[in-house]
Amino acid sequence: LNPEAPVPILRETEVKTQKGMAWNVRENLMSFGIEVYILTQEERIIKRRFIDQRYNQQLLRVDIEDEVKPLEYDLPTEDFDALVISDYDKGFLTTKRIYELVEWFDGPVFIDSKKTNLPVEYAYIKINDDEYSKLDKELKDSPNLIVTKGSQGVDYQGKNYPAIGVSVFDVCGAGDTFLSALVYLYLLYGKIETAIPYANKAAAIAVTHFGTYVLSERDVNEVCN
């Protein structure tokens, strides 16, 4: 305990650097063998977590954020199989930009966003239980909502898909892993209801690791079998 104030003293023993947010989605999509074209900004948001390794307990998080500006980009001319939007609502992506991207793309669209005013009629929207509770009632009835509920599984079109029972160490980035697997398996099978159980398996692997986690080749084989 710090003699200067009633707070713990931390001794640094190990430092790990991991990509998060949209970059975590990109890395996990690539782990499935998908070629990814990413639109993002140069500004960075750093989340520095302090973990007590003896008890696997997070003690503190410090956020370091550059001044965030809305994303400026030229739309790519290549052909793509899917559009994936990962938006933590930090200011990079406006609602107007999301609608523009969805209108531009001719194919399946997947959105994971903390915003509540989303184009639910034109895209698959992955949100968590807390985000779902904040939606307007008319949006809650959309057939395109994929609601992740942690240990209670995933709800889609009135059906619940059970979660995989594992020892949870850290849920950080698990939604990114779920989204990446969902996109890959949807492109493989063409059905969301077929892709969800596989995505649940991927998320179950992610939560057994600290911080954001990129699926290994072994993990991918486990998910897909």
Over which residues does each language-model region extend?
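Structural motif
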Residues: 61, 82-85, 110, 126, ...
